[in-house]
């Protein structure tokens, strides 16, 4: 919300519609009367709607109002959890210990709430045998099915086999799909 509102002497309209500090309508008053009312209450006269005729002004503590607005904005930013996509790169002929390390790494990403993009890179003639890459990616998906579900099935994209695993279980995915289907019906 923009905090560049006109307050007190910055308001130039000759007559304004005034709202009291507790929200009651005080009617249309001259700017001098409205400023006197605000001064008596030891508060500010703030123009909240300048495009109406006459402009709407509210008697309030402007400093407290500004503080509340910035606090709400900060809280809403904190509440938003941004899901990042982390990538784990594999090769079709990866050794078991290296594979287990990659599974642990992907598991840590998913447990933190991030999506994991599993990509199996083919080099040279490895592309002639894409089934080896499919086996590795399927093993990775099976190793992570207790903490995440496959959001996009493995598909070949150039020289890479790519799959995305999202946090949650298959049950949560089915619930989300069910709710989404009900929303589309309505």
Swiss-Prot record:
Keywords: Cytoplasm, Initiation factor, Protein biosynthesis. IF-3 binds to the 30S ribosomal subunit and shifts the equilibrium between 70S ribosomes and their 50S and 30S subunits in favor of the free subunits, thus enhancing the availability of 30S subunits on which protein synthesis initiation begins. Transmembrane segments: none annotated. GO terms for cellular component: cytosol; membrane. It comes from Chlamydia muridarum (strain MoPn / Nigg). One of its GO terms (molecular function) is ribosome binding. It comes from the Bacteria. Its main location: cytoplasm. The keyword ATP-binding does not apply. One of its GO terms (biological process) is ribosome disassembly. Belongs to the IF-3 family. It is found in: Cytoplasm. This is Translation initiation factor IF-3. Monomer. The keyword Protein biosynthesis applies.
């Amino acid at each position: 919300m923009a905090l560049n509102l006109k307050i007190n002497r910055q308001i130039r309209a000759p007559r304004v519609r005034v709202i009291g500090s507790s929200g009651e309508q005080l009617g249309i008053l001259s700017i001098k009367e409205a400023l006197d009312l605000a001064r008596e209450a030891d508060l500010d006269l703030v123009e909240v709607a300048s495009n109406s005729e006459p402009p709407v002004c509210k008697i309030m503590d402007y400093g407290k109002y500004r503080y509340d607005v910035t606090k709400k904005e900060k809280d809403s930013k904190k509440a938003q959890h941004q899901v990042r996509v982390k990538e784990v790169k594999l090769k079709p002929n990866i050794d078991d210990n290296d594979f287990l390390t990659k599974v642990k790494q992907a598991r840590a990403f998913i447990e933190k709430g991030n999506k994991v993009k599993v990509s199996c890179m083919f080099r040279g003639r490895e592309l002639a045998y894409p089934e080896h890459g499919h086996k590795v990616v399927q093993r990775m998906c099976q190793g992570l099915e207790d903490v995440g579900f496959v959001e996009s099935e493995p598909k070949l994209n150039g020289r890479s086999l790519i799959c995305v695993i999202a946090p949650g279980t298959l049950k949560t995915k089915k619930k989300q799909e069910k709710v989404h289907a009900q929303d589309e019906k309505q």
